[in-house]
From Swiss-Prot:
Primary subcellular site in the record, as a coarse category: membrane
Keywords, comma-separated and alphabetical: ATP synthesis, Cell inner membrane, Cell membrane, CF(1), Hydrogen ion transport, Ion transport, Membrane, Transport
Alphabetized InterPro entries for the sequence: ATP_F1_dsu/esu_C_sf (IPR036794), ATP_synth_F1_dsu/esu (IPR001469), ATP_synth_F1_dsu/esu_N (IPR020546), ATP_synth_F1_esu_C (IPR020547), ATPsynth_dsu/esu_N (IPR036771)
Organism: Nitrosococcus oceani (strain ATCC 19707 / BCRC 17464 / JCM 30415 / NCIMB 11848 / C-107)
A Pfam family that the UniProt record links to this protein: ATP-synt_DE
Topology of the protein relative to the lipid bilayer: Peripheral membrane protein
Keyword Signal: no
GO annotation, cellular component aspect: plasma membrane; proton-transporting ATP synthase complex
Family affiliation: Belongs to the ATPase epsilon chain family.
GO molecular function: ATP binding; proton-transporting ATP synthase activity, rotational mechanism
Cell compartment(s), UniProt: Cell inner membrane
Protein name: ATP synthase epsilon chain
């Protein structure tokens, strides 16, 4: 029998996922991390991006997180996200509109612009769109 671990993905609003997985991939600050059962304990910050879960049945689940923390214990992994949602639930039109607004804000040299905020909004929209693209590719 393959080794598994319990994963909880929780946002400020609600629990998004709770179940058994073989492996988790997450967008840590220093790059993507892959977590398997019995991984050494770890706490790291997450940047906006996709969390991917490989389930024992062979199924993969995709989630978008806007940032947060990843806590790893030998048999339990917790993703504490600022906001999180299943990739299938992301509104693609809204993500495209947010990307467009952020790109326009970054090009507006005369307006009062908070570059850090505009860049964060752009990164978030791009991460959402990537999550949508990956799930579409996976589903064929």
């Amino acid at each position: 029998m393959a080794m598994t671990m319990h994963v909880d993905i929780v946002s400020a609003e609600r629990e998004i996922f709770s179940g058994t997985v073989n492996m988790l991939f997450a967008p840590a600050e220093m790059g993507e991390v892959g977590i398997m059962p019995r991984h050494t304990p770890l706490i790291t910050r997450l940047k906006p991006g996709e969390v991917r879960l490989q389930r024992p049945e062979g199924q993969e689940d995709f989630f978008y997180v806007s940032g947060g923390l990843l806590e790893v214990q030998p048999h339990v992994v917790t993703v504490l996200a600022d906001t999180a949602q299943r990739a299938a639930d992301i509104d693609e039109a809204a993500a495209l509109a947010a990307k467009q607004r952020a790109e326009e804000a970054l090009q507006d040299r005369e307006g009062k612009l908070d570059y850090a905020r505009a860049q964060a909004e752009l990164a978030e929209a791009i991460a959402q769109l990537k999550a949508i693209q990956r799930i579409r590719k996976k589903l064929g």
